[in-house]
Curated annotation (Swiss-Prot):
E.C. code: 2.7.7.23, 2.3.1.157
SUBUNIT field: Homotrimer.
Protein name according to UniProt: Bifunctional protein GlmU
Functional description taken from the UniProt entry: Catalyzes the last two sequential reactions in the de novo biosynthetic pathway for UDP-N-acetylglucosamine (UDP-GlcNAc). The C-terminal domain catalyzes the transfer of acetyl group from acetyl coenzyme A to glucosamine-1-phosphate (GlcN-1-P) to produce N-acetylglucosamine-1-phosphate (GlcNAc-1-P), which is converted into UDP-GlcNAc by the transfer of uridine 5-monophosphate (from uridine 5-triphosphate), a reaction catalyzed by the N-terminal domain.
Entry keyword Plastid: no
Subcellular location: Cytoplasm
GO molecular function, one term: glucosamine-1-phosphate N-acetyltransferase activity
Chain positions covered by the region annotation Linker: 227-247
The gene coding this protein: glmU
Family under the similarity heading: In the N-terminal section; belongs to the N-acetylglucosamine-1-phosphate uridyltransferase family.
Length: 454
């Protein structure tokens, strides 16, 4: 039986007080609904149906590569009505799993359990027991069997004492679900068509309803306001940090670590406080990342050390590199083994060769730098002429003195020495010494100007 997943994402999210649709608000750097889509995809669903309404253009623009079937709910008439909009394109022989775009923490393990316990021709329902169930629909049972769900606003005082609540997540056979949805009414306090009412309909039709509980209660929490969004973020990060530590990564303070992508680590990796990981990041064995660093879409090989407050994006570092503090590697930066990039050095689309060093206050853009090169403090590759970028090539064993400007396109051949304060506009030959400084003048008896009194 094929699996179709319906994700409800049509709500406006008024309490967010935002023009952005609620499900596009980020957790771990990605829209909440993107997490749900990825979880659904991990279940090998044949098709994912995304029910949208408010902010449809923004959602389609943000999720244009999500590979989902877009289902419009023009009027928000309740969760039952929302699911009904997706049903016409779902074959009768399929099973339907209903998820929510604002519950990004739901795990594949929990959903696989739910799919396993679903009875034939019946409903698998995800419930959770809460110490404070206020606001949630209560699970009604008779002789231990689920017979219905009552929403908070429709519950009696006695029913409000029930602590087993509905998460909204359920799986049901498509043919029967279509029948149950067609019988829904909006005779309730909200005047809406509740998806929860299909539970009573299934019970009355003689279908079995089995329940499962999530791995942890926080998985099924949603976000209706910024406070709840922040709480989801913290739980996500706590879970991510715990998993990394179980895999052998040292986090000096797990509460001050943010994972906004994926992180693959070798053995004995150490991350100091306030490190942020974005995109896909790979760290080799014994890599150390200092406090306040931001790593995005990069690979850092064994025994490299990144000192505090460095930013590395779209870059590849070989073994034993040292970077920072306060360095910036922009997309296209490559460091060969044992290369060193020091404080306030910026690389963009540049390769620094084996054992080469750029220790201080330099910009190296669109550059190819060989092995055993010393880049003096204040060196600038002038790569942009106002219209086009040009390349600087510095071959092996070159010594570049401090405060040197290399006006690209230019090549400095092997073993050359560039004197401090030089502006290099022409190619330099092998083992040449180049100086372009003006002659130093000495004026004796010089008196500084005196400030005139007003």
């Amino acid at each position: 039986m094929s699996l179709h997943v319906v994700i409800l994402a049509a709500g406006k999210g008024t309490r967010m007080r935002s023009s952005l649709p609620k499900v596009l608000h980020p957790v771990a750097g990605r829209p909440m609904v993107s997490h749900v889509i990825d979880t659904a995809r991990s279940l090998n669903a044949e098709k994912i149906h995304l029910v949208y309404g408010h902010g449809g253009e923004a959602m389609q623009a943000r999720l244009n590569d999500a590979d989902v079937e877009w289902v419009l709910q023009a009027e928000q008439l309740g969760t039952g009505h929302a699911v009904a909009q997706a049903m016409p394109t779902i074959p009768d022989h399929a099973k339907v799993l209903v998820l929510y775009g604002d519950t990004p923490l739901i795990s594949p393990v929990t959903l696989e359990t739910l799919l396993t316990i679903q009875p034939a021709n019946g409903i698998g329902l995800l419930t959770v027991s809460l110490a404070n169930p206020t606001g949630y629909g209560r699970i009604l049972r008779a002789d231990g069997q689920v017979v219905g769900i009552v929403e908070q606003k429709d519950a009696t005082a006695e029913q409000q004492l029930i602590n087993e609540v509905n998460t909204g997540v359920l799986v049901a056979p498509a043919k029967q679900l279509k029948q149950w949805l067609s019988g829904l009414t909006n005779l309730n306090a909200q005047g809406e068509y509740y998806l929860t009412d299909v539970i009573a309909a299934a019970h009355h039709s003689g279908s079995s309803i089995q329940t499962a509980q999530p791995v942890c209660a926080q998985e099924v929490e949603g976000a209706n306001n910024r406070l709840q969004l922040a709480q989801l973020e913290r739980f996500y990060q706590k879970r991510a940090a715990e998993q990394l530590m179980l895999e052998g990564v040292t986090l000096l303070d797990p509460a001050r670590f943010d994972l906004r992508g994926t992180l693959q680590c070798g053995e004995d990796v150490l991350l100091d406080v306030n490190v942020i990981i974005e995109g896909q990041v790979e760290l080799g064995h014994r890599v150390q990342i200092g406090a306040g660093c931001v790593l995005k879409n990069c690979r850092i090989a064994d025994d490299s050390i990144i000192s505090p407050y460095s930013i590395i994006e779209g870059s590849v570092l070989a073994e034993g590199c040292t970077v920072g503090p306060f360095a910036r590697l922009r997309p296209g930066a490559e460091l060969a083994a044992q290369a060193h990039v020091g404080n306030f050095v910026e690389l963009k689309n540049a390769r620094l060769g084996l054992g080469s060093k750029a220790g201080h206050l330099s910009y190296l853009g669109d550059s190819e730098i060989g092995a055993n090169v010393n880049i003096g403090a204040g060196t600038i590759t002038c790569n942009y002429d106002g219209a086009n970028k040009h390349k600087t090539i510095i071959e092996d064993d070159v010594f570049v003195g401090s405060d040197t400007q290399l006006v690209a396109p230019v090549r400095v051949a092997k073993g050359a020495t560039l004197g401090a304060g030089s502006t290099i506009t022409r190619d330099v030959g092998e083992d040449e010494l180049v100086l372009t400084r003006v002659r130093q003048h000495h004026i004796t008896g010089w008196h500084r100007p005196v400030k005139q009194k007003k």
